[in-house]
Amino acid sequence: MRRREFLGVLGGAAAAWPLAALAQQADRMRRIGVLMYLASDDAEGQARLAAFAHALEQLGWSDGRNLRIDTRWAKADDIGKHAAELAALAPDVLLAGTGTATVAPLLQATRTVPIVFVSVVDPVGAGFVASLAQPGGNATGFTIYEYSMSGKWLELLKEMAPSVTRAAVL
């Protein structure tokens, strides 16, 4: 009987151990640094940041409860300073909130903190990542334009509008 009790306690402890680890992680305040190349009163920038915070909240991450979002609004002359400030805070991740203009200063500020970018036209051409499939380094993100898809886009255009003989891209 003692052997069964011991095995029961051991099994219960083994089953509960991962739950204790998860509980400890939830107590740790996570930190996100956001660099925006916009004025702090820019309506579009505020809307983007609000949407980001709302999406995080839906996933259980609430600013002030288990997450801290540090945002810096930068202009051309002080973007490097703001990127360095954010990197010095040692966040869990940095968000380059307004595309190409914010990625380069963040990469100059840190090569260890993960950087996530949004709406960068050509991250490979800009030297932010090695490739889209395997970015390497500490930067990754979303591109709004993939040059290798140009042929497919023209093929689809021809299929949708066979009478079109010329197309221009701006």
What residues fall within each predicted segment?
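Short hydrophobic alpha-helices and adjacent helix-cap/hinge residues
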Residues: 1-170
